[in-house]
Design a protein with these regions (language model features):
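PLP-dependent class I/II
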Residues: 1-249
Length: 249
């Protein structure tokens, strides 16, 4: 298993030029996920086209996780499968957990390359015998009926994003505005030596708990992840406690 750093200077996109020839030749598949958790990176058209060319050149299977496809705030996003040649090299996964709030149902779907889907079906048939039927029927209803709930969910997350990010900026913590997902990926203040030190002090002084970036890998050091899952009142209370703590002065 080879991991790839997702860095701010490359908009948290995979840099294919950093993948050495031996790694590329030995690789059997590449797991890609945009919009990305935890970095909030969003892939553009050029990235997907490069991904397909790279996969074809090195005979690599692409497994694209598009769970946050509907949680984009700066215009519509893309499916990997929209691009020419994508179905030749990979499949795409999606989930009803984020779009429809069905996290507890544990249901999603995959589509794309027929051969890969066939192998996935064979694997699933050996692991389990399918989802509980009422859950499947509920998922079908979610996918086929009025989709205004999706826009409502997106707007709610966007509102919380704006509230949290602008609030952090107002107390002296200058963090980036994410383009998508239900998270905020924030660089820790310069005066703290590492993510865990910042997380501990923030919690001790304010009761606000965030996730240290290094929990997601070594390249996450220096960052924290915050989830946009709390009410406006809770976010405002957290910002007030953070402001009073003096940590951002």
């Amino acid at each position: 298993v080879v991991t790839m750093p997702l860095l701010k200077e490359n908009d948290y996109l995979i840099d294919f030029d950093m993948i050495d020839e031996k790694t590329a030749q030995d690789a059997k598949y590449m797991i890609v996920s945009y919009p990305n958790n935890p970095t909030c990176g969003v892939a553009n058209d050029e990235f997907y086209k490069k991904l397909i060319v790279f996969a074809k050149k090195h005979n690599i299977m692409v497994l694209h996780d598009n769970a946050y496809s509907e949680l984009l705030f700066e215009g519509p996003g893309h499916s990997f499968l929209e691009f020419e040649g994508a179905k030749d090299v990979g499949i795409e996964f999606n989930s009803l957990s984020k779009t429809y709030g069905l996290a507890g149902a544990r249901i999603g779907f995959a589509l794309g390359n027929k051969e890969i889907i066939g192998k996935l079906k064979s694997l699933k048939s050996n692991l389990d015998y399918g989802m509980f039927l009422p859950v499947q029927k509920g998922a079908i209803k979610a996918l086929t009926q009025d989709q205004s709930c999706v826009e409502k969910t997106r707007n709610a997350y966007k509102h919380r994003r704006d509230l949290l990010v602008n609030g952090c900026k107002s107390i002296g913590w200058d963090i980036d505005m994410p383009k998508g997902t239900m998270f905020v990926w924030a660089k820790i203040p310069d005066k703290f030596k590492d993510s865990e030190t910042f997380v501990k002090e923030l919690f001790d002084k304010t009761g606000v708990l965030v996730v240290p970036g290094n929990a997601f890998g070594t390249q996450g050091e220096g960052y924290v992840r915050m989830a946009l899952v709390q009410s406006d009142d809770t976010i405002e209370h957290a910002l007030d406690m953070m402001d009073k703590s003096g940590l951002f002065k």
